[in-house]
């Protein structure tokens, strides 16, 4: 799929995110929106997957380590055809299979339940090691938040991945600079992120704009050429990307839009869509 078409899909994913959160009246828009382009690139371009056979043995695996941004994952899964888009508005509702964090037992396309920060990357490392031991060809991708990497478990997993030279694993960090309590650098700075992963024998790819499809494509194309090292892609993004009043605002880490805010958010995204159609 061409980059422009991927951008259009990502904009639809953002609309789905906002719509689901508005219906839920709770959840995490900021980090879901910042990673919408990444979700789109993975599921529409990068990964070997089949929505009609979500458990096929040779599929690539994805683990959402920052599990609170499940609305982003659910939205791209729906757009990709894993389940009906209409189900997105049941997010967090009693009896819905789409709860606040991913559940691998109930949601088609989810490879790992996640939510407790730091555990997702550990699971992804285990999947990658399993593939190596079984001589399987699938690749494993995991997405972490920059606030999440304050968790010590992240670095235990990174140490193991680097030591085992798991070149079938790609660790992605959504570096949007904000977490629930404020700026990541003020709460407990993990910077420079790239140097830390390099210290654990990772091949590191810095992406200046993780909301740009061309830059994401270049990063993942490079990752596929790396042998004998795990790859970390550290992408700078905008928290709340696409919605004017949410962008770079820490208050939108974990708050759903009310009716007025929802209308404004959808108007913003409609304008983005119109601009993309004119290109």
Give the ranges of each region predicted by the language model:
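Non-catalytic, mobile gating and regulatory segments of ester bond hydrolases
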Residues: 1-5
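N-terminal capping segment at the start of a domain
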Residues: 9-26, 174-176
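Cofactor-binding active-site loop characterized by glycine-rich and histidine/acidic residues
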Residues: 17-20, 32-163
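Structural motif
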Residues: 25-33
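Glycine-rich beta-alpha junction loops
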Residues: 68-69, 73, 176-177, 236-240
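Short secondary-structure boundary/capping segments
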Residues: 80, 187, 247-251
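Thiamine diphosphate
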Residues: 109, 113-116, 121-225
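Glycine/aspartate-rich loop-and-adjacent alpha/beta segment that forms the canonical ThDP
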Residues: 213-279
């Amino acid at each position: 799929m061409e980059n422009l078409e991927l951008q259009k899909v990502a904009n639809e994913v953002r609309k789905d995110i906002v719509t689901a959160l508005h219906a839920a009246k709770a959840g995490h828009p900021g980090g879901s929106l910042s990673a919408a382009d990444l979700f789109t690139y993975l599921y529409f371009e990068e990964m070997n997957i089949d929505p009609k056979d979500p458990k096929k043995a040779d599929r690539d695996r994805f683990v959402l380590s920052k599990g609170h941004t499940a609305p982003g994952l659910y939205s791209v899964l729906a757009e990709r055809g894993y389940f009906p888009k209409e189900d997105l508005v049941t997010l967090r509702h009693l009896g819905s299979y789409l709860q606040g964090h991913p559940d691998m037992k109930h949601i088609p396309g989810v490879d790992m339940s996640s939510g407790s920060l730091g555990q997702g990357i550990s699971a992804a490392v285990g999947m990658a090691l399993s593939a190596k031991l079984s001589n399987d060809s699938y690749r494993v991708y995991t997405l972490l938040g920059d606030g999440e990497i304050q968790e010590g478990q992240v670095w235990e997993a990174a140490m193991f991945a680097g030591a085992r030279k798991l070149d079938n694993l790609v660790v992605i960090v959504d570096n949007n600079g904000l977490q629930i309590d404020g700026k990541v650098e003020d709460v407990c700075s993990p910077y420079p992120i790239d140097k830390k992963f390099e210290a654990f024998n990772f091949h590191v790819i810095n992406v200046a704009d993780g909301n740009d499809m061309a830059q994401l494509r270049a990063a993942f194309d490079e990752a596929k050429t790396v042998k004998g090292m795990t790859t970390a892609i550290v992408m700078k993004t905008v928290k709340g990307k696409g919605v004017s009043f949410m962008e770079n605002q820490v208050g939108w880490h974990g708050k759903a839009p009310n009716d007025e805010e929802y209308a404004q958010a959808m108007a913003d995204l409609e304008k983005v869509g119109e601009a993309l159609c004119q290109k």
